[in-house]
A protein has these predicted regions:
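Electrostatic, structured charged patches in enzyme active sites and in nucleic-acid/phosphate-binding
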Residues: 1-145
């Protein structure tokens, strides 16, 4: 079906960039099957009382927005106007929870080989700015029991 569509309209049917498929269900929207499976695993751990305060898609500010002042020349006077020079940079963690009083931040990746340069920088900034080390989850077979 996709090949026929592509030939009829002379376009390429796009696949997900890293081969993941979004999951939408009663629990919410997840970027991959791995992320949804990890959510089920962690929510069971929370019900058993092993972890607490499980949260999804938590945003951490890494670099605040940068503002500057530009002088506007009006007919009667000059006026300084605040303008945005650079947008803020933030990291959105897949999962954040607490175990034994320690905050744990996790990010699900399909493979340890599909880690982008942006993620590497944001992971280092998380450690530097918030003193939190991001744990990479790549395969269900390596999850702790």
């Amino acid at each position: 079906m996709q090949e026929v569509f592509g030939r009829l309209f002379q376009c390429k049917v796009m696949r997900p960039k890293y081969g993941n498929h979004k999951i939408k269900n009663a629990y919410g929207t997840y970027d991959s099957q791995l992320e949804f499976a990890r959510f089920l695993f962690l929510s069971n751990r929370e019900k058993e009382g092993e972890i607490t305060n499980l949260r999804r898609q938590v945003e951490y500010l890494l670099i605040p927005a940068q503002y500057g002042t530009e002088i506007k020349h009006l007919k009667t006077k000059d006026k300084g106007v605040r303008m945005l020079l650079e947008r803020s940079c933030s990291y959105i963690a897949d999962f954040v929870y607490e175990r034994n009083g320690e905050t744990i931040v996790e990010d699900c990746k399909g493979s340890k080989y599909i880690i982008t340069a942006d993620f590497k920088i944001k992971k280092k900034l998380m450690l530097w700015v918030h003193q939190i080390q991001v744990k990479i989850i790549s395969s269900p077979t390596f999850w702790e029991k």
